[in-house]
Amino acid sequence: MANKLVRGSLIIFIGNIIFRIGGYIYRFLMAILLGPTAYGILGITLPFQGIFQTLAAGGLPPAIAKYVAEYEAVDEHDMARQTIYTALKIMVFLGIFLGILMIFVVAPVLAYKYLGKPLALVPLQIVGLITPFSVIVGAFRGAFQGVYKMEYIVYTRAVEQLGMILCATAFVLIGFSTVGALWGTVIGYSLAAVSAIYIFKVYMPKYIPKPSENFTFTRRDELKLAGTLVKFSIPVIITA
């Protein structure tokens, strides 16, 4: 266990350094290619992107990691897998709901009334398209953390960042400006979501076997599990 923790911490530490550099490269490229006005609009959207991603995740990725680790420790593989599925349902619902809210309500209010910048409307609306993909990625990263496979988290982050940098740069060069930069982010997260699903289906059965045939889990059981996950996630989302 200690070796797993040390190895996982080292992988995440190295990954964070690499992705921090990647983040600087992204901002540097966008600052050069977009110019002051368009880059300023992009800068306006980034805080709201972070806020909505945090709200959509609902503090559930740490809850997934905690309960998956606990169930796996006592060989309750069916419950570990069910924890992931139940949390994923909650997160996808939140991601879609908050995405729609951002597109049709929050973005217009922010652009016209709060910021007074109509040009920021479409970029802010695109932020709403990011959340459904980001929550899928977050849920599976929580699952990967629960079985101490930190390298899987790094792989999905690499796909996310490379996709975002390459697509955003290409779209901006084509002439789509801030909108193109944000579409690059959408594509980056969508590719990361696909990679996370692929890793979960292909490689995770080694650590969390597929459900046994005699495993039964009623709607009432799922509601109880959902309540447990949400109860754990509330302090996480408040502090986030």
Provide a role label for each language-model segment.
Residues 97-116:
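Short membrane-interface helical motifs at transmembrane helix boundaries
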